[in-house]
A protein has these predicted regions:
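Generic anion/oxyanion-binding catalytic loop in active/binding sites
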Residues: 1, 13, 20, 38-41, ...
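Short, acidic loop-to-helix structural element flanking the phosphoryl-transfer center
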Residues: 21, 37-65, 71-75, 124
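Asp-based, Mg2+/Mn2+-dependent phosphohydrolase catalytic module
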Residues: 50, 54, 71-179
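Conserved donor sugar-nucleotide recognition element shared by glycan-biosynthetic enzymes
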Residues: 4, 45, 103
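Alpha-helical substrate-recognition element adjacent to the catalytic core
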Residues: 1-21, 26-28, 33-38
């Protein structure tokens, strides 16, 4: 009788945990759905981004988008900002890598996706990052990192070792092409 009661208690505990996990999953799904609904109407391209993308396309410079956003969010953002035309299948999602940012793995995977050697070619890659987590990953991958001021303060990006900070792509192009 004791063994039967212990198994019943164990099963009840497992069911309780399972219900909590399902409820958490449901809440997460709803939160992400609400995020996408709000974000799609408020996303705005940074100044100079379209011109910058056209310039690197004209020079046949390979590019890849690397993000920690869940797939649905990443696809929505790229489409809403009309960046999907430039990246197509060239997107690395941190959540689908062995390690997500701030680990360098997503950037290493991005370089490999472009046919680059992460050890030999990282120094020739430029990464635009607006988060300390992403900048940390890119610096650790050995890339040249340009911090973009969207929601973070410059000092937060400087602390993790970015090489340059700009407010948008127009400023980057002005500084880069004047060299």
């Amino acid at each position: 009788a004791e063994e039967k009661e212990r198994r019943r208690d164990s099963l009840a505990e497992k069911l309780k945990i399972w219900r909590q996990e399902k409820e958490h999953e449901k809440m997460w799904t709803e939160k992400e759905k609400e995020y996408r609904k709000r974000a799609i109407t408020s996303l705005v391209r940074l100044n100079g981004l379209s011109e910058f993308m056209e310039q690197i396309d004209a020079k046949s410079i390979p590019k890849v988008a690397v993000t920690n956003a869940p797939r649905e969010n990443a696809e929505m953002m790229l489409k809403a900002l009309e960046l999907d035309i430039w990246f197509k299948d060239l997107v690395v999602l941190g959540g689908e890598c062995e390690h997500a940012k701030p680990h360098p793995q997503p950037y290493i995977d991005g370089m490999r996706l472009l046919g680059l050697d992460p050890i030999e070619d990282a120094k020739d890659c430029i990464v635009f990052e607006d988060s300390p987590s992403g900048a940390t990953a890119a610096v650790a991958a050995g890339c040249y990192v340009c911090g973009v001021l969207t929601s973070q303060k410059a000092e937060h990006l400087e602390e993790v070792g970015v090489h340059m900070i700009v407010k948008d792509f127009q400023e980057f192009s002005g500084r880069f092409y004047s060299c």
